[in-house]
Amino acid sequence: MQQAPVLASAADPASEAWQANEAAHHALADELRTRLATARLGGGEKARARHVARGKLLPRDRVDTLLDPGSPFLELAPLAAEGLYGGAAPAAGVIAGIGRVSGRECVIVANDATVKGGTYYPMTVKKHLRAQEVALENRLPCLYLVDSGGAFLPMQDEVFPDREHFGRIFYNQARMSGAGIPQIAAVLGSCTAGGAYVPAMSDEAVIVRNQGTIFLGGPPLVKAATGEVVTAEELGGGEVHSRTSGVTDHLAEDDAHALRIVRNIVATLPDRAALPWSVRPAEEPKVDPAGLYGAVPVDSRTPYDVREVIARVVDGSRFAEFKAEYGTTLITGFARIHGHPVGIVANNGILFSESAQKGAHFIELCDQRGIPLVFLQNISGFMVGRDYEAGGIAKHGAKMVTAVACTRVPKLTVVVGGSYGAGNYSMCGRAYSPRFLWMWPNAKISVMGGEQAASVLATVKRDQLGDDWSAADEEAFKAPIREQYETQGNAYYATARLWDDGVIDPLETRQVLGLALTACANAPLPQKDHAAPGFGVFRM
């Protein structure tokens, strides 16, 4: 079998630029590790100690116990809600991700009761719903490790009433179960009010004796409403729901026992469907991935050849480039990552009409062949100016945006630099429903750069004031705008609000993409109607 050409690196490890890049990336990676370590502590040492004193496993220990030994866990949005709510909700108070349980990829959603009793802040809801979206798109069983006091009542107006609020969790459970996607719950602590529907709407539910409780109204509410005095265990404990109400199906003695039962349930599930594409044995890149730190500038404004990234991410550093001589500010081609076939779309400069047409053509090819797409974003936008507008750059850009929106194959996006304006759309930003989207720590995302925004707004202001506006006044006007864009475009600002699925170390890019592709392979590709096949690939 003929193999694709091997990419070589032109970057010089002895150069000053390499050394500067490497040092900057190391500093960013250290900051990322520090932030992640803080988030993983949940509610802090005192809350963790109280949790353990009750005989419970810590939330992350629960996840580790559930997973197959030694298998990886692809965590989703581990820094969600960072800096929000006065810092009261690390990781948004819930752990979510994809892991292997009894040999099967599953989505795991585990409440962290060390964070405000596992109650749901607005970002907790958003993260839980995002995990369910991942499960639905990739047809992955959902495993809920429940230990939650329900909605965070002081913010009920941002948690309860709207379409994408708390109630959507149970809607999603019903719809996924109806679609044959297993829903399994283990009640390891409180399961209160609306949250009681998590186990009640699961296909199978486990509860821990003298620890798990399920009730729509807790003892204080029952007393206030009816005058009845009852303990939590008498009202909705494991014995009640396993022997009397039938809300749960399995009674466990402790967390470890409950998690073993969940593993056994997963082991009984039917085998997943055949893989939607051929997967070959993985091959490590021939160009050392550790060189990503040195080869890639931290500042997205500094030009470099994006093939330096591709060579360090794909199997064997092999890359069959498509249309290499045309539209050269967009690199497209075929490769494999952890054995999975991928079509890569990577920015190598600003987008011109030719680049956009090339991108649209390539995306259509991948759709036709059932090949997942990987977008490597580092884009300041489309070229502007009279000649380019007259040349139809808007309609050519629209072709690529349409192709991105309409393709049937899985899309995975990594923001490795800037993500600005319409370039974000053409390169499969969040609005274009990539199966997954991650950002590097150096990444930036905004409608435009801070300097450009400040200049645009300053021009409008100057036109209003005329000669009365001095250079000092202009700078005083522009400085806070630049600062605002710098803050709001930061990767950590973005990930705290779940604009992505997490900030990742560049050196983890290959592994993260491989795990995500494995998850994507659980879902069949939508089939075209051969009786009405529609259009073939248009040569743009």
Question: Across the structure, where does each feature detected by a protein language model lie?
Answer:
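Ligand-binding clefts of soluble mixed alpha/beta catalytic domains
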Residues: M1-M540
